[in-house]
Amino acid sequence: MLGSYQVAMSIFGVMMTFVSSGIPVVLSRNVSYYSAKNDKKSIGSLVSSGLIITGLICIIVSGIILLFPNLLSIIFTSNASTEMIYILLPALIFSSIYEVLRGALWGRKKFFIISVTEFIEQVLRIILLFILFNTTFINISATNKTALSLSLACVISAIIVIIIYFNTKGNLSNPKYEFKNLLKESSPITAVRTASSIVSSIIAIIIPLRLQTFGYTANEALSEFGIIMGMTFPLLMIPSTLISSLAVTIIPSISEQSNNIDSGNLKDKSILKSKINFSIKSSLLFSSLLISTFIALGSPICKFIFGNEKSGIYLSYASIIMIPLGLSQITSSILNAIGLEMKSLKNYIISSAILILSIFFLPKYFGTYALIIGYFLMSLSSAIMNISMLSKRKLINLSFMKTILILVLINVASATLGIFIHNLLNINLILDIIVSTIFTLGSNILLMLCFNIANIKIIIFNRKKKFA
């Protein structure tokens, strides 16, 4: 049953990506730009257009599923997964409404409201799940109850966001002014995010098969793949959460200066450049913060969390991905914020091709580590191409390359200290991790402050003032 749930949720995730992943990003960007000009008519037109576009896509997707149920039978081997998709259709429809209005609120910098609504949605899911699992008159399977709780939570959350949107002076107006532009600008972003889901599926197929070709058994190949993707990579993604939060708060202020840099929509280039450089330096800080800790303590950390030391070995090697991954993430967001989504799509396609080629050819020489090398090359190539796009438009100060070099040296020094402390200690695993992390992470932060990598006070206390 759990397998059926995972399969159904994977397909639902792809559907959600296809329906509404690009619209909220472009909508928030343009709402931010028009808000700075106090152009309420264009904002209303954008929101109306977003609701119509996502609504039409939802109708088409839902119609295909309802009119051609045999399509799901081809995709799924279990009827349980098919039933879940039917139950999740209301979640698809109401989530699309939620995402559009959330994008509009994001563009208007209503960050606290967005956080509250997302928190409410999660609380609703827990409460509804508890009620459904303790209700006897609803005679459906546990997985279907889980799907139903998600659908109900999405419906209620959408209603709450609708009320909040109009109570905060949100408006709707004739969509004809922005419909075509919104559809055109959001398509590349939707393509990137849908392709990302597809690429993940391709990787899940290619890596085990290639490992089997070079001596692994089927079980060994799947096990190694599961260790890297299920244990190692989630820890590598910790800085990505911080960078995503940075993007949420700073991207609207970037879009205020220009929602399409190549068309000449630009208020103040010096301010725009300042914000872009701040974003990049902050992402470097977040990305490099845990590298030395993961290099020195990957094995004990993963042994404690997962009971698997091998995932920790992978983590130590894979930590080199974190800086190019963070750069790729923030620069992609910046390109989308200033109307260069087609450039971002092109860069993504090229970097994804590098990843797929790497995991196809490199397992012969590096085994499972080919996946780590592939993601490193993908992130590095994406970051270089994105930075090149910004550099050509004179929107970036390449002095951050010096910052990267200093951060690498700092992490080497901190990791060396961490390894020394870890080898010196002969104590309980948890205490070992705590003490070694204090020395490793502490020395990392101390060296960053000594080399003036980041002014912590400015980042924490003055960010609102700097980007108001």
Question: Model-derived features: where do they sit?
Answer:
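Membrane-interface junctions at transmembrane-helix termini in multi-pass inner-membrane proteins
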Residues: 94-116, 320-350
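Helix-loop junctions and terminal segments of transmembrane helices
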Residues: 21-36, 236-267, 273-280
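Alpha-helical transmembrane segments of multi-pass membrane transport and lipid-handling proteins
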Residues: 48-75, 273-324, 356-357
